[in-house]
């Protein structure tokens, strides 16, 4: 499908963060490898990437091999995410074409929001580190909704916060769980191939698959 066919008529753009606004997957993968070894568990790249879009608690329970209490999962999450931020900080940058797309949306009067499964500290790290917080009318993190992707909660929460009906929203995602969540919310979805292959994202029924935001700027 051509970009215009997906983007035309949109009143809001809702962006996932990890792997979408920022191409940071490699640093999350490195952090999970180091972190999981601390707990005597070796994860493969395929496992980590395959779980992209799931909650951190899901990851922690896979590492432990058992259910985790809320306190235990939170403690482990804080440890892993601190490691990730340390690894990624010297490389923090917007994904190619993201700034241009955000600027174009602003000129067109399209409302922008962030809806992420990331913890608040990671979202603050990116938005404040890149000085783009004021671009977004709403920022939704994992503490603001009950069910993680592929449930639609994060995107529906974002749409409610900005006052735009789901059919008028376009979601930008990089993960299969995110694509499924966007469709479950009744939204169109553009998927980037930063963490999943084109074939995988097309099989998940993404409305449009692109390698980067620059393809949307033609």
Where are the regions a protein language model picked out?
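Residue-level signature of catalytic and energy-coupling elements of molecular machines
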Residues: 20, 116, 151
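Hydrophobic beta-strand core positions in alpha/beta domains
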Residues: 113-114, 191
